[in-house]
Amino acid sequence: MHPQDISISEYTYTLPSDRIAHHPLAERDASRLLIYGGGAIDEDLYRNIAAHLPTESLLVFNNTKVVEARIEFRKPTGARIEIFCLEPPAEYGGIANALTQTGRVSWRCLIGGASKWKPGQVLRKEMPGGLVLEARYKEKQGDTFLIALSWMPAELSFAEVLHRAGFIPLPPYIHRQAEAEDSRRYQTIYARQDGSVAAPTAGLHFTEAIFQSLAAANIRHDFVTLHVGAGTFLPVKSATLGGHTMHIEFIDVSRELILKLRDTLAAGNPVIAVGTTSARTLESLYWLGIGGKDLVVRQWDAYGGQDRGITATEALARLLDRMEQDGVRRLVTTTQLLIGPGYEWKIVAGLVTNFHQPESTLLLLIASLIGEDWRRVYDYALEHGFRFLSYGDGCLLFNRASMETQA
């Protein structure tokens, strides 16, 4: 069956509201860890994760940083308008560049209270320290709105403006306002690159102590960047997967990491992705390696049979050659890769991840990695009191077939 024909109703489960974690635990690494491999299920705490990883593994994390993408304005009438900055128009060449803009920028946004705001109207927000921010409604674009933002002092970057005027955008299933503590806890300790509107939540559990334990166990780690968009929360609303449009996200990967991945796989050692965003980035590298000149990954690129038996090491070698020819040290592009049941994993042998919403593309990704056992894993987690979603517990899932064959 082609993934486009998959019925979404087959990938659901009942998630009681009291199982959704609305606050993080006091200690990051005290979260529970479900371990699945070879059909067996076990559990531990995140602080002991090194004991469950193969020696010589390479863990790959997403070092994106959540920006304070929600801004609240008040109209002169007192009406509240909230702007949720999603992504810049294509003319800016990506999120990272748009965040460096000074004085003014345009952004695609979701609007809370949109019916109270008319095209052309300007909202004004004055902040302590002299920051004055104005927002003008330009036009509606599908489900989003194009908003022109300008500010004084004009020398401030948009990233600085968001930091001073905005607040952290918590997921829609966390039914509370963002608190001061969320600025720290809804952020990984290794977050470096501004650009996400949602955290790569699998990494929220990791602490300096865990990184020390990984090094002591001869388990290496490195980083990619994928800026997480609000599309990560969108449920699949179509009856089949073919009716769903996967969101496009920006990725940034260094030549050094691609070399490390190639050598790790060539030596027969496993690559473990920390988070679904890292997994999608890593798998996208394979398709970039065997793809065309435009160096982007589209939604269904993995399902056309174009791999023709090309191994992951060969694909990465081709990608490195292409980067050498182009004289680039970093690969900055976009991916729309949809990973669902029927996908043949190329690079990732294991995944550290949280528990995901029913009928989501993230749950489909889990099903593609461990097959129908995703039901056993989720049933176990529900029956044994695991906490779900962004601030919840997580799991370490191994794709044994991938670990045995990828080199």
What is each of the regions a protein language model found here?
Residues 1-407:
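Surface-exposed, charge/polar-rich loops and edge strands
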